[in-house]
Structure formats: structure tokens, C-alpha cells
Design a protein with these regions (language model features):
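Single conserved hydrophobic/aromatic residue that forms the stacking wall/gate
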Residues: 1-11
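Alpha/beta catalytic cores of group-transfer enzymes, especially the acyltransferase/condensing modules
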Residues: 16, 74-200
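Acyltransferase loading domain of fatty acid and polyketide assembly lines
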Residues: 16-35
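Alpha/beta-hydrolase active-site loop
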Residues: 38-45
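Gly/Ala-rich beta-loop-alpha elbow adjacent to hydrolase catalytic centers
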Residues: 44, 62, 66, 78
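Conserved acidic catalytic loop of the alpha/beta-hydrolase fold
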Residues: 47-55
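Short beta-strand immediately N-terminal to the catalytic nucleophile in serine-hydrolase-like folds
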Residues: 57-61
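Hydrolases whose catalytic domains are alpha/beta-hydrolase-1, hotdog thioesterase
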Residues: 69-73
Length: 200
């Protein structure tokens, strides 16, 4: 009951129908980062609250968007404030990078030193690619404009990397890269207006 109550309270406070989006889509809208971020946040928080009813959760941690979920679950941040933040965060990101002009590339089975060398080599040309996320050993995520992504694919295809594979991330905006520098500055202004509490 507590989980349903928390969800209902958040649904009522948004300037779009979050509950309908969660239940009915459409997928094209959910894939836009300004909507995917709040839907993922709410879903992950509610799942954590439900899981805690089954067994106590003592520690939370999160990366990127997941950090907001961890802050909410540990009572550092109100869920309604977090939804407001990530919706604004997603909107800023969406506005910063026109849809379809940039992306994120997962590079599998490439030694990390080779990944960094590839980035250096590509950045010495007319392209700019950033190391976005180190997901796991042999799983690197890069971010940049489409032309830089293609440069990475060509670099790998023309090199002696027998087991290396690539895959595009299904996101409308690349994360953790230079293309979002201005969005980061704008988000900081809203973050300064939100109350953060000690975890409990």
C-alpha cells in the first residue's frame, strides 16, 4: 500500500501523465531521455521499496541516473523532487543535442589501453569522442557525434581486433560527454534549489 501511495503522489505532481506513460507508452516517447529518465527513476525506486518489504536493504548506490534513485531510497531526496530534477535533466540533455546527431557506442572485448589509444588517435583528427562509462571489464561506452562514432567503428574494423564488437546504445542523447557541458551548468542551478538530507 505504501508503494502505491508513493507512486500516486508522484504521478499527480507532474506536468505530463507519468502513470499513463509507464503503463501505455508509446515506446518512441519513453525512449526520449526527458521521459525515459523519470520513468526509469520511478520504476527503480518503487521496485526498491517493494524489495525492502521482502528483505531489508541497508546500502544503496547508483551511477548517473541511478544516483538519483539511490538518493531517494536513502531518504536524502524527496521522490517528487527527484522526478522534477531528472525530467529537467533529460529535457536539457535533449535540447543540447539534436535527436539523431550523436550517440553512444558500446565497445566489447577491447583492452582498456587500446580503447584509450583509439580515443587519443581519433581526437587528434577532426573528430571528438569521449570515454563515457566503464561498465565492466571489457565493456567500454564511448559518446560523441555520429561522425565520431563512425570513426571508432572504422578504427576497429581496420585494426587487428579479432574479438572486438560494437553496439549502439538505444538512447536519444549521449551521456557523460562534452556535448552536455552547457546542460550541466543549467542543471546545477536547479540542484542548488533542492533540499538534500542526510541518509536515514
Amino acid at each position: 500500500q505504501g508503494v502505491s501511495s508513493a507512486a500516486s503522489d508522484v504521478y499527480k505532481r507532474q506536468d505530463f501523465d507519468l502513470e499513463d506513460l509507464l503503463r501505455n507508452g508509446p515506446e518512441e516517447k519513453i525512449n526520449l531521455t526527458e521521459f525515459s529518465q523519470p520513468t526509469i527513476l520511478v520504476t527503480s525506486v518503487l521496485l526498491a521499496k517493494y524489495s525492502n518489504k521482502l528483505s531489508n536493504i541497508d546500502i544503496t548506490a547508483g551511477l548517473s541516473l541511478g544516483e538519483y534513485s539511490a538518493l531517494v531510497y536513502s531518504n536524502c531526496l524527496e521522490l517528487s523532487d527527484a522526478v522534477k530534477l531528472v525530467n529537467y535533466r533529460g529535457r536539457l540533455m535533449q535540447e543540447a543535442v539534436p535527436e539523431g546527431t550523436a550517440g553512444m557506442l558500446v565497445v566489447l572485448n577491447m583492452p582498456i589501453n587500446d580503447v584509450y589509444k583509439m580515443i587519443d588517435d581519433i581526437n587528434e583528427s577532426d573528430e571528438t569522442i569521449n570515454f563515457s562509462t566503464d561498465n565492466a571489464d571489457g565493456v567500454s561506452v564511448l559518446a560523441g557525434k555520429n561522425s565520431a562514432i563512425e570513426a571508432c567503428k572504422n578504427y576497429i574494423a581496420n585494426g587487428e581486433f579479432r574479438r572486438v564488437k560494437t553496439q549502439m546504445v538505444q538512447m536519444s542523447v549521449p551521456s557523460h560527454c562534452y556535448l552536455l557541458d552547457e546542460a550541466q551548468e543549467e542543471l546545477a542551478k536547479l540542484l542548488n534549489e533542492v533540499e538534500f538530507k542526510a541518509p536515514s
